[in-house]
Amino acid sequence: MSASSNSTAFHEPADGAVETHNGAAFFDLDRTLLAGASGEVFADAMRLAGLSSKPFPGEKLLFGLFNTIGETLPSMALARQAVTLAKGHSQAAVSAAADQVADRLVAMVQPFADAAFEMHRTAGRPIVLATTTPYDLVKPFADRLGLDDVVATRYRVREDGNYDG
């Protein structure tokens, strides 16, 4: 679910002032923050961005398997191939496609999330989405939820605004 610090950390800067930190709350995406996995939604986003034109053979089966048992070595290998698919494609197009599907992900958020977010905010903890999903895909979703930060896979982008693969 979430990991957070229950203790307050103290740091004494060089000027003698004392800072306090209440930690942070980290939430994973698939089958934690979301009721299922995000793969099917992001596959649709990739098609919207022009990274693929149609579902690959066995796609529905793979997404169903991931929703049921989680990450496996084959599914991780498939995810690694996404960077190859992204090579030469526009970061802006991927971000725009992710923005178009973000509300579908918001609809999948677990019922506990609002109360958990409020508890952490009240305690002064920033809320962070932590996922291996590419940043450009999850950032619009995190923004919709009002999260404070995102820790995610980042693809390099060339000067022309396209992924370098």
State where each predicted segment sits.
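C-terminal cap/substrate-recognition subdomain and adjoining C-terminal extension
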Residues: 1-16, 22, 96-97, 103-165
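Active-site neighborhood of HAD-like aspartate-dependent phosphohydrolases
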Residues: 10-70
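Short, flexible active-site loop motifs that bind/organize anionic cofactors or intermediates
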Residues: 29, 84, 128
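Generic structural "secondary-structure junction" signal
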Residues: 35-36, 87, 157, 165
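A generic alpha-helix surface/boundary motif
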Residues: 37-41, 76-77, 92, 96, ...
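Acidic/polar active-site rim loop that often engages polyanionic ligands
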Residues: 39-42, 61, 77-79, 160-164
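Short, compositionally biased "basic patch" segments
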Residues: 61-91, 145, 149-155
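Metal-dependent phosphoesterase signature
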Residues: 77-111
